[in-house]
């Protein structure tokens, strides 16, 4: 049977469900697929099928994530749901599932709980652009309590820097929707309308400023130096001016040739593995870990704040805690750079399995911006992961 071609007639958006354990994230994910399946916009997925999510490895970390696809009249969605709380934290920090927006699920019977707060904070830290709230289990909650829960939620969202007064809060019962109850199904359709309208359409990678991390360097006698790598974003054309950023002082050059699979091209774009021939650049001046980018689009830095997750011993991480001044390697894009860690005030040590905010100072500058992900390594072994939350200098 011929494979169905992927139709690009609708914008593609990545979303996920977040929230406290047992508040109904997976039930909601199953309900969305079952309701949309009735109009042929999804394949219905069972709760149990989503709940026993396969394990994946991202930056050396094993994460269980369920991927579900569906569409509305306006968009095509890829939706992720994680069975365990630790999986959520790892997912958000490693960016394994980059979210353009998220549905925060809160049980109306409980209101915001510790993980609700933690997921909102993480969403803020790793720059999830927008949240929509699904207030679940409203069929078994006291209506007066629901009003209080909604107020409390709006305050909590505002406290963490989201527009709490404007965020859509949809009330419903995911379980009833899953069981085919018309009221339940109506709430799911309302939720999808809110997601369509409130979660902004992401800028496609090709529309962003050009950037390619350097993986390897060659010199072609009589022609110059070639940097190879996978183009992370944007488009590059022969004759474009670029900057070489990171590790050493920033230099400028011009792309005089683009090669892909031994063929010469006029342009390369996001996702392509390409070799860029650079005018007037010595082979020694280019090395793995640098990036070739649109001039002025990215700058090199050594000091930043980050949200990090430290692997548990069972996940192949450290067996012992670390302390202030810990000096591992930070793996950005294609290379390791040593850096020292400063712990927040009042934190004496970090145990395997912890997630927290830290300050880092690298021994060499790396091209970086907020939301850039990295792995924390010791001698090539991954012991943690992080996301840049703020550049200091």
UniProtKB/Swiss-Prot annotation:
Chain segments carrying region G1: 19-26
Enzyme class name: hydrolase
Annotated ranges, domain tr-type G: 10-203
Region (G4): 136-139
Amino-acid positions noted as binding Mg(2+) in the UniProt annotation, renumbered to this chain: 26
CDD domains named in the record: EF_Tu (cd01884), EFTU_II (cd03697), EFTU_III (cd03707)
Localization, UniProt: Cytoplasm
GO MF terms, alphabetically ordered: GTP binding; GTPase activity; translation elongation factor activity
Main subcellular location of this protein, as a coarse class: cytoplasm
Sequence segments annotated as region (G2): 60-64
Residues involved in GTP binding: 19-26, 81-85, 136-139
GO cellular component, one term: cytosol
Residue ranges of the region described as G5: 173-175
InterPro entries: EF-Tu_GTP-bd, EF-Tu_GTPase, EFTu-like_2, EFTU_2, G_TR_CS, P-loop_NTPase, Small_GTP-bd, T_Tr_GTP-bd_dom
PROSITE patterns: G_TR_1, G_TR_2
Keyword terms, alphabetized: Cytoplasm, Elongation factor, GTP-binding, Hydrolase, Magnesium, Metal-binding, Nucleotide-binding, Protein biosynthesis
Function: GTP hydrolase that promotes the GTP-dependent binding of aminoacyl-tRNA to the A-site of ribosomes during protein biosynthesis.
Family label: Belongs to the TRAFAC class translation factor GTPase superfamily. Classic translation factor GTPase family. EF-Tu/EF-1A subfamily.
Protein name: Elongation factor Tu
Source organism: Chlorobaculum parvum (strain DSM 263 / NCIMB 8327)
UniProt lineage: Bacteria, Pseudomonadati, Chlorobiota, Chlorobiia, Chlorobiales
